């Protein structure tokens, strides 16, 4: 039975959280009540608690920018913006803080974070849930962008990104 993308993300994040107590997951609706808009975080809040898996306000600049502070105190956040269309308010933080920290500090302050941005999801999301933003974010120096085509690649990309000191 093939594993769908959503399950691959869930399994990868669960394995990372089981192995590393500094791993956090937060973002829009990933907490206990919903477990992600696509259920990609289902059961994680129950398993790891509200201190490690929690919802944030719908404030993408905060979600992305907070990873700088979380990394500075030794945590390794995995954050999610619900849909690619929603990333725009957070681009300033991604471009000016997250992407440059490791290089500006000569490796002293890496931002160990993963930013998950679901894109190309099933259904018809209309003009505000269906955009492709990769042509913009791939031009930001200092971050890596992965666009998996199957569940195995997604799981591998998440786990590889987690151990990379760059965002």
Feature-to-residue mapping (PLM):
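Thiamine diphosphate
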Residues: 1-166
